[in-house]
């Protein structure tokens, strides 16, 4: 699992996956979510996020080309593409030329049409109602 946005701290899915031991490798290479308040992101902050995403992209390409994996999860890569931290055409090219046996999962909101076009399966999850909207905090074992 290569995380493009998340920094690797405080995410419940990581705690669960750690229990699988060596069966799962997690590389958290992001600087955290950046656009909760887009107007307050400085140019310097944006450049740090872009540099981290570019480093994550280089690592991803190396791992894809290594042919060492059956599955690679590109966590929040759609967000990174949407925020223009990673070029969508580079991702499409990688998807078209990855080893045939390699399965990939791309997560995150705002998948570009170019990504959807090359995908075999696309699933969209939408919140209909969420406890957070009522002020109910995240629950251990549910959200983390």
Model-derived segments and spans:
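Phosphate-binding/switch loop-helix module in NTP-utilizing enzymes
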Residues: 38-100
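Conserved P-loop
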Residues: 1-63
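Phosphate-binding/switch region of NTP-binding enzymes
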Residues: 109-144
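Short, well-ordered coil/turn elements that cap or connect secondary structure elements
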Residues: 19-21, 66, 99, 116-117
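Structural signal for conserved beta-strand scaffold positions within catalytic alpha/beta enzyme cores
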Residues: 26-28, 106, 124
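Short, glycine/charged-enriched secondary-structure capping and boundary segments
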Residues: 14-18, 41-42, 86-90, 118-122, ...
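Conserved nucleotide-binding/hydrolysis micro-motifs of P-loop NTPases
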Residues: 5-9, 32-34, 78-79, 110-113, ...
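Sensor-1/coupling segment of RecA-like P-loop NTPase cores
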Residues: 94-112
């Amino acid at each position: 699992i290569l995380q493009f946005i998340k920094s690797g701290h405080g995410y419940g899915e990581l705690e669960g996956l750690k229990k699988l031991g060596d069966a799962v490798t997690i590389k958290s290479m992001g600087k955290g979510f950046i656009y909760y308040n887009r107007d307050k992101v400085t140019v310097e902050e944006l450049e740090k996020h872009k540099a981290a995403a570019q480093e994550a992209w280089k690592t991803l390409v190396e791992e894809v080309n290594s042919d060492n994996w059956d599955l690679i999860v590109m966590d929040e890569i759609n967000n990174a593409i949407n925020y223009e931290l990673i070029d969508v055409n580079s991702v499409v090219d990688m998807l078209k030329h990855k080893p045939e046996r390699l399965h990939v999962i791309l997560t995150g909101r705002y998948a570009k049409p170019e990504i959807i076009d090359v995908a075999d399966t696309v699933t969209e999850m939408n919140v209909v109602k969420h406890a957070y909207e009522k002020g109910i905090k995240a629950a251990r074992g549910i959200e983390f």
